[in-house]
């Protein structure tokens, strides 16, 4: 599985996930500087107020 792993508005980059990871994720939250986005492999647990999107196909988290 290949997932995007760039932060916020950085140019797109991807990473090859380990074979036991079956999801890509995109987390989005707001801080004092504006909205932040984090992407990567897996499907993490998030705190209240953080938007999370998990998906299972290559590069589905952009």
UniProtKB/Swiss-Prot annotation:
CDD domains, per the entry: TFP_snake_toxin
Functional summary from the UniProt entry: Binds to muscle nicotinic acetylcholine receptor (nAChR) and inhibit acetylcholine from binding to the receptor, thereby impairing neuromuscular transmission.
Domain of life the protein comes from: Eukaryota
Disulfide bond annotation, renumbered to this chain: 3-24, 17-41, 43-54, 55-60
Subcellular location(s) per record: Secreted
Known tissue expression: Expressed by the venom gland.
Protein name per its UniProtKB record: Short neurotoxin 3
Alphabetically ordered keywords of this record: Acetylcholine receptor inhibiting toxin, Disulfide bond, Ion channel impairing toxin, Neurotoxin, Postsynaptic neurotoxin, Secreted, Toxin
PROSITE patterns in the cross-refs: SNAKE_TOXIN
Family: Belongs to the three-finger toxin family. Short-chain subfamily. Type I alpha-neurotoxin sub-subfamily.
Entry GO terms, CC: extracellular region
MF annotations from Gene Ontology: acetylcholine receptor inhibitor activity; ion channel regulator activity; toxin activity
Chief place where the protein resides: secreted
This protein's record includes keyword Disulfide bond: yes
One Pfam family linked to the record: Toxin_cobra-type
